[in-house]
Amino acid sequence: MKQYLDLASYVLANGKKRKNRTDTDTLSVFGYQMKFDLTNSFPLLTTKKVNWKAIVHELLWFIKGDTNIKYLVDNGVNIWNEWPYENFKKSPSFQNETLQEFILKVKTDNEFAKQFADLGPVYGKQWRNFNGVDQLKKVIQEIKENPNSRRLIVSSWNPSELEKMALAPCHSLFQFYVEEDKLSLQLYQRSGDIFLGVPFNIASYALLVYLVAHETKLKPGYFIHTLGDAHIYENHIEQIKLQLTRTTLDPPQVVLKSDKSIFAYSFDDIELVGYNYHPFIYGRVAV
């Protein structure tokens, strides 16, 4: 994925040091766009191994309208664990449990999970119930009935509920576009963590194009990724530099193995074929 490596190189060369809500400064630029052709390949990063299982389960979690991490941790996906844990640490029920002990309680105690493992009205809630509107279902119906519409938009940015969210939406708004028999999507992402988050976001929204295209009897077209604050955390700079020394490998393919509704898809209905990658590179998330 040359587009991603070009982004990383650009931010290393042009980014300005900025403070933020976390304790780790960033190199940041404002305004950057990438475009991925989804016609014959899938944009999953090859210069390090990316957790495909986490990408798929997180997207299905969004689509279901879920906001509780129990579904994720039950399926071995731990990308959201830190946020509810930080909230739990502020509660009177906290007894110095470690993060690992917290997650074990989420897995084994349904009442505990209901009380402490919810992230608030984050992505899934907004996609499926934005002040009473099922945006995802509505936009899919609109694609079918009025494909030339310029209002094929889903927003995760709900100002009336931001304070209730564990994390304000980073990927905040997306728009579909139909041209002949192809479906494209443009994402506006207000904040992009280039090392950890952006590779996930690229793959997640590309997969969303595949799923919605399948649902609407269209073919995948393009994924356009527009970033607002595109940044590299200072503790990820060496990892990014390592990636830039690696050769991009041929991209994989994605095969959808079911004709069921997008709202009924499971992990086993989605197959990743031919994913070759360089070794995993660890980086710590900034909470």
UniProtKB/Swiss-Prot annotation:
UniProt binding sites for dUMP: 21, 150-151, 190-193, 201, 231-233
The keyword Lyase appears for this protein: no
Principal subcellular localization: cytoplasm
Database matches in InterPro entries: Thymidate_synth/dCMP_Mease, Thymidate_synth/dCMP_Mease_dom, Thymidate_synth/dCMP_Mease_sf, Thymidylate_synthase, Thymidylate_synthase_AS
One Pfam family of this chain: Thymidylat_synt
NCBIfam families attached to this UniProt entry: PRK01827.1-2, PRK01827.1-3, thym_sym
Name of the molecule in the record: Thymidylate synthase
Gene source species: Mycoplasma genitalium (strain ATCC 33530 / DSM 19775 / NCTC 10195 / G37) (Mycoplasmoides genitalium)
Gene that this sequence comes from: thyA
